[in-house]
């Protein structure tokens, strides 16, 4: 079972971004493979720390994790800890920490005199999400797409599989997503395929290297000469797609489900974004939800409350017989076990609570009125609170003594 991301970084759930980054830097330096050669345990911890930081440093992923646990972020965090993933993309935080300690400066600029001046170059090419190798092959990442999925309480109780059509950006079939009419692209003449431009500045403290995204190709490393007339060189166009969504039992209104790679297609061969499905719970005409339990209001006649009875009540999957014990008082909650919402993490379901209320007719006929008058004469059925011979209170007795 995966450990809690907050526990891995050793921070509270209320920690802000600075606290999370500080904890990450400390642990990343501690378990970095260069400091722990041939140490498998340290290597695994380093991956674990990167995975936790990738989620908690991203506002959207952190919100999904807080609401839905590891299921809310799916496998995105784990995939991010490999080469080219977001986890190693934040490895610059480690280099920033090295610069803080040894050169006294912050930021991304590097000096030729720093003992770690070449350290970042090694990793940015092999691991960083901003490395030139990634730009040459990955294109532009597609954007995430968010939709709302309305579900009934019955669907939420058992879990459901939905197949729906959505509108999204899809890969252009005419150019196969390249954006080029001929299907070919050329190496960018400005950055020569690296996706970035570098400018060296010499100062009295050494040489600074400033790196920025290539303005010609936007960081892709390649340019389109003969634009596709169907997608205007973007490699994507508006379209439709059919997606299958598996919703587990026990989700709540506002929960997120993330379908990896089901979002908008990326321009010119870029990886697709994710489809974020926001759960919307429809109001139910019979039941009210309380966590994984549901509540049903049942009106019962006065005679049945007094003498007891058996009544058929609805559930989310049919009807069951409920025994009303003799002498049941109004607003009593009777429990029917296992007839509520399935638990999100599995292992059973919540309960159905029947709230018993007394039924009071708005109008009665002459015969029924006579029956009620007869019942009213019984002090057991209707205690006569207006009887002058009722037992006096202690205050009334004291008043009689001193009057």
From Swiss-Prot:
GO biological process: chaperone cofactor-dependent protein refolding; DNA replication; protein refolding; response to heat
Cofactor: Zn(2+)
Cellular compartments per GO CC: cytoplasm
Localization annotation: Cytoplasm
Chain intervals annotated as zinc finger (CR-type): 159-240
GO molecular function: ATP binding; heat shock protein binding; unfolded protein binding; zinc ion binding
Residues the entry annotates as binding Zn(2+) 1: 172, 175, 228, 231
Superkingdom of origin: Bacteria
Principal location: cytoplasm
J domain sequence ranges: 4-69
InterPro entries in the record: DnaJ, DnaJ_C, DnaJ_domain, DnaJ_domain_CS, HSP40/DnaJ_pept-bd, HSP_DnaJ_Cys-rich_dom, HSP_DnaJ_Cys-rich_dom_sf, J_dom_sf
UniProt-listed Pfam families: DnaJ, DnaJ_C, DnaJ_CXXCXGXG
Cofactor note: Binds 2 Zn(2+) ions per monomer.
Sequence positions that bind Zn(2+) 2: 188, 191, 214, 217
Entries under PROSITE patterns matching the protein: DNAJ_1, DNAJ_2, ZF_CR
Keywords: Chaperone, Cytoplasm, DNA replication, Metal-binding, Repeat, Stress response, Zinc, Zinc-finger
Swiss-Prot/TrEMBL CXXCXGXG motif repeat ranges: 172-179, 188-195, 214-221, 228-235
Family annotation (PANTHER family): CHAPERONE PROTEIN DNAJ, DNAJ HOMOLOG 1, MITOCHONDRIAL-RELATED
Function noted in UniProt: Participates actively in the response to hyperosmotic and heat shock by preventing the aggregation of stress-denatured proteins and by disaggregating proteins, also in an autonomous, DnaK-independent fashion. Unfolded proteins bind initially to DnaJ; upon interaction with the DnaJ-bound protein, DnaK hydrolyzes its bound ATP, resulting in the formation of a stable complex. GrpE releases ADP from DnaK; ATP binding to DnaK triggers the release of the substrate protein, thus completing the reaction cycle.
Domain remark from Swiss-Prot or TrEMBL: The J domain is necessary and sufficient to stimulate DnaK ATPase activity. Zinc center 1 plays an important role in the autonomous, DnaK-independent chaperone activity of DnaJ. Zinc center 2 is essential for interaction with DnaK and for DnaJ activity.
Family named by the database record: Belongs to the DnaJ family.
Subunit structure: Homodimer.
Name of the protein this chain belongs to: Chaperone protein DnaJ
Native organism taxonomy: Bacteria, Pseudomonadati, Chlorobiota, Chlorobiia, Chlorobiales
């Amino acid at each position: 079972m995966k450990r809690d991301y907050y526990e891995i970084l050793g921070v509270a759930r209320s920690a802000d971004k600075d606290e999370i980054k500080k904890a990450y830097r400390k642990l990343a330096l501690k378990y970095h493979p260069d400091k722990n050669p041939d140490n498998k345990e340290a290597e695994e911890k380093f991956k674990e720390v990167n995975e936790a930081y990738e989620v908690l440093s991203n506002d959207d992923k952190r919100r999904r994790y807080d609401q839905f646990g590891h299921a809310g972020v799916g496998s995105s965090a784990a995939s991010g800890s490999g080469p080219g993933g977001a986890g190693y993309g934040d490895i610059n935080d480690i280099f920033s920490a090295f610069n803080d300690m040894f050169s006294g400066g912050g930021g991304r600029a590097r000096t030729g005199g720093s003992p770690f001046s070449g350290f970042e170059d090694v990793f940015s090419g092999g691991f960083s999400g901003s490395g030139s190798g990634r730009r040459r092959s990955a294109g532009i990442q597609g954007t995430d797409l968010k939709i709302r999925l309305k579900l009934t309480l019955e669907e939420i109780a058992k879990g459901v599989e939905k197949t729906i059509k959505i509108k999204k950006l899809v890969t252009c079939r005419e150019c196969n997503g390249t954006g080029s009419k001929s299907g070919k692209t050329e190496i960018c003449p400005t950055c020569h395929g690296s996706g970035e431009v570098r400018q060296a500045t010499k100062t009295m403290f050494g040489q600074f290297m400033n790196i920025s995204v290539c303005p010609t190709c936007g960081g892709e490393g390649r340019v389109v000469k003969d634009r596709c007339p169907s997608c205007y060189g973007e490699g994507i166009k508006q379209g439709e797609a059919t997606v299958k969504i598996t919703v587990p039992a026990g989700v709540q209104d506002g929960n997120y489900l993330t379908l990896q790679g089901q979002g908008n297609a990326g321009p010119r061969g870029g990886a697709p974004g994710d489809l974020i499905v926001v759960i919307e719970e429809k109001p139910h005409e019979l039941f009210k939800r309380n966590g994984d339990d549901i509540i049903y209001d049942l009106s019962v006649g006065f005679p049945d409350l007094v003498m007891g009875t058996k009544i058929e009540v609805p559930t989310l999957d049919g009807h069951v017989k409920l025994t009303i014990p003799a002498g049941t008082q109004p607003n009593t909650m009777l429990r029917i076990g296992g007839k509520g919402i399935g638990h999100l993490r599995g292992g059973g379901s919540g309960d159905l609570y029947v709230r018993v209320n007394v039924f009071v007719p708005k109008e009665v006929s002459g015969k029924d009125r006579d029956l009620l008058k007869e019942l009213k004469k019984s002090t057991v059925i209707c205690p006569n609170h207006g009887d002058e011979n009722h037992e006096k209170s202690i205050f009334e007795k004291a008043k009689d003594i001193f009057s």
